[in-house]
Regions:
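C-terminal extensions of enzymes
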Residues: 275-340
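Hydrophobic faces of well-ordered beta-strands that scaffold small-molecule active sites
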Residues: 2-7, 27-31, 62-70, 95-99, ...
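Active-site-adjacent beta->alpha loops and helix N-cap segments on the catalytic face
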Residues: 43-47, 78-79, 102-125, 180-195, ...
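Active-site glycine- and acidic-residue-rich loops that bind
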Residues: 7, 103-111, 133-152, 211-215
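Glycine-rich phosphate-binding active-site loops on the catalytic face of alpha/beta enzymes
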Residues: 93-107, 173, 224-243
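Catalytic cores of alpha/beta
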Residues: 75-86, 212-225
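Glycine/Thr-rich beta-alpha phosphate-binding loop at enzyme active sites
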Residues: 160-193
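Active-site beta->alpha loop and helix N-cap motifs at the rims of alpha/beta catalytic domains
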Residues: 33-119, 126, 133-136
Length: 340
């Protein structure tokens, strides 16, 4: 299983790269279509940043991928805009793509995915598709993807000449922070049944929404067909210096206010400024993520002391995740596959 890290600001990347090099763990660096709207990055600058940092840190032996996460289509008329984004990410050097039409019903999802996947498949690059909107609360089994649906979807793609590597599903995870009494609820037995249902096409599972999941549970993912695991909000928590529980979920008050640790992350003064902005602009709760763009210049300019403590925490936590995902030491195997 390979960890995928969503990079919303520049601060945690060095620690993740250093951990990847130390453990010989391949890693996927990714950014979602939505994140391109609330971070400083566009497709080209994202690739340039990731590649430049790997070069600067001397990574010459541990492979990494650059992934277009959640390239989302919510309705058919958005396909043209999304096709342009796929083209821009192809031109920038992205190596894998997650085409996400899961907000639509199954039939239009299949049709849109078949269409949008063509340039990715034509370029011989990696493809992830999605069935069942992540975090959905309505529909069959409260929105959970079902094995028969998954088999129908992958078979339909295959008949259309599209053979994805990974299927993202709704199996009980959410994106972002678990607030209040909500808690992590990834259904591993359902996940395994879905994986088994799509094995005739040799497709594996991509697990979204890992932030807030225990390391013990993550170690079980590989036994349930999961081969890629997305971690995003966790790195933001580290960068902002937020208090977290043992599973990496941010600790919050009843009003969804975060708790800043004075010895973690960005300077307290910068966090206070960010939170004031969030309150004034209606971006509290999960929308604090939008501070990544609004405060990009100040985040990039934090002093050495703060950058180093973010790097150190990201390094240690990335090592734990590489170990839990069983990806430590896999670099050689990946290189052998890529060069065969």
């Amino acid at each position: 299983m390979v960890m995928a890290a969503n990079i919303r600001c520049r601060l945690p990347l060095e620690g993740i790269i250093r951990a990847s090099m130390a453990t010989k763990a391949p890693v996927i660096y990714e950014i979602a279509k939505s994140e391109l709207g609330y971070t400083e990055f566009d497709p080209m600058s994202f690739v340039e940043f990731v590649v430049t940092e790997n070069d600067r840190l001397g990574n010459t032996s541990v492979p990494f991928a650059i992934h277009g996460d959640h390239i989302t289509v919510k309705k058919p008329e958005e396909k043209g805009e999304v096709a342009e984004l796929i083209g821009a990410e192809l031109a920038a050097g992205f190596t894998t793509f997650a085409i996400d039409c899961s907000h639509m019903e199954n039939d239009p999802n299949l049709a849109a995915t078949l269409d949008l996947a063509q340039p990715v498949v034509g370029a011989g690059l990696g493809l992830e598709v999605e069935l069942g909107e992540i975090g959905a609360k309505s529909g069959s089994a409260e929105g959970f993807t079902q094995p028969d649906e998954a088999a129908w979807f992958i078979e339909g793609l295959s008949k259309g000449g599209i053979h994805p590597n990974l299927l993202a599903i709704n199996n009980g995870s959410i994106h972002g922070t678990y607030f209040g009494t909500t808690h992590e609820g990834i259904q591993l037995e359902l996940t395994k049944k879905i994986w088994q249902a799509i094995q005739p096409w040799k497709v594996d599972i991509a697990q979204h929404g890992i932030t807030g999941t225990s390391l013990d549970k993550i170690t079980q993912f590989i036994h349930h067909g999961i081969r890629k695991g997305n971690v995003g909000t966790f790195w933001q928590n580290i960068s902002f210096g937020l208090a977290m529980n043992q599973n990496g979920n941010a600790l919050t008050t009843a009003e969804k206010h975060y708790i800043k640790r004075p010895y973690r992350g960005v300077p307290d003064e910068l966090w206070a400024k960010m939170w004031k902005w969030a309150e004034e602009t209606g971006n509290t709760g999960g929308n604090i993520k939008k501070a990544n763009k609004a405060f990009a210049d100040e985040l990039n300019a934090v002093g050495k002391e703060f950058k180093e403590r973010i790097t150190l925490q990201a390094y240690e936590e990335a090592i734990r995740l590489f170990e839990a995902t069983n990806s430590a030491g896999l670099a050689g195997e990946v290189v052998a596959i890529l060069t065969a």
